[in-house]
């Protein structure tokens, strides 16, 4: 395959020089076509206030208060952040045995992992 001159595309579609059926030919639009340019954008001017909304009374001036909760449910109190601190007690009678056992298990696991990886 020559990358400087690739083969012609033979996919589906019209033959070169003929427009696809159902599409107008490219070039100047036919007579009667709408004038060129962009259509007007945005909404038409409605005045103030917008005429589509009823005249509600104005809200209170100044900073607004927080919206109250739904009146059908009781209002919850402030959040309770109860934290229970539990400290595990140490047993002095077997601390040496526990440390030795934990060390042996760690060494055994490391040896098994090294054997599996090699």
UniProtKB/Swiss-Prot annotation:
Record's GO cellular component terms: membrane
Keywords of the record: Membrane, Transmembrane, Transmembrane helix
Bias kind Low complexity: ranges: 1-54, 64-74
Membrane topology: Single-pass membrane protein
Region called Disordered, residue ranges: 1-82
Entries under InterPro entries matching the protein: CYSTM1-like
TM annotation in the entry: 95-112
Subcellular location: Membrane
Keyword Kinase belongs to the record: no
Family: Belongs to the CYSTM1 family.
Name the record gives this protein: Cysteine-rich and transmembrane domain-containing protein 1
Provenance organism: Danio rerio (Zebrafish)
Organism placement in taxonomy: Eukaryota, Metazoa, Chordata, Craniata, Vertebrata
Gene behind the chain: cystm1
């Amino acid at each position: 395959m020559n990358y400087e001159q690739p083969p012609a595309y033979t996919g589906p579609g019209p033959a070169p020089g003929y427009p696809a059926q159902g599409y107008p030919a490219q070039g100047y639009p036919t007579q009667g076509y709408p004038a060129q340019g962009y259509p007007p954008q945005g909404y038409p001017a409605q005045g103030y206030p917008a005429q589509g909304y009823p005249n509600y009374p104005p809200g209170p001036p100044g900073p607004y208060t927080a919206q109250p909760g739904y009146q059908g449910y009781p209002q919850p109190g402030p959040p309770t952040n109860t934290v229970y601190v539990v400290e595990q007690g140490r047993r002095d009678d077997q601390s040496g045995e526990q440390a030795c056992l934990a060390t042996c298990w760690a060494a055994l696991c490391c040896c098994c992992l090294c054997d599996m990886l090699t």
